[in-house]
Amino acid sequence: MFLVKKIAVRIRGIDTPELNDKREEIRNIAIKAKEELEKLFNSGNKIILYNLGRDKYFRLLASVKVGDIDVAEYMIKKGLAKSYDGGAKVW
């Protein structure tokens, strides 16, 4: 028997725009970011979480790889995320 529970994990080192942002151009980037992450996570490659910790709000935080792809670097290169160190929001 398997017990399955969804757990939200924030990707270490990046900030993506909010889907409910008032600015349409930012919302469009947020939608593209969500779609790109879904595509990446559903690719069938192994998902690896490492460097686990908690952010300042105690949310689960991890570095993430899908296959050989570092997800944070990938999203930044695609222009769908910005580098983030836990300080002020960057969008």
Model-identified regions with their sequence ranges:
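Small beta-barrel nucleic-acid-binding modules, primarily SNase/OB-fold domains
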Residues: M1-W91
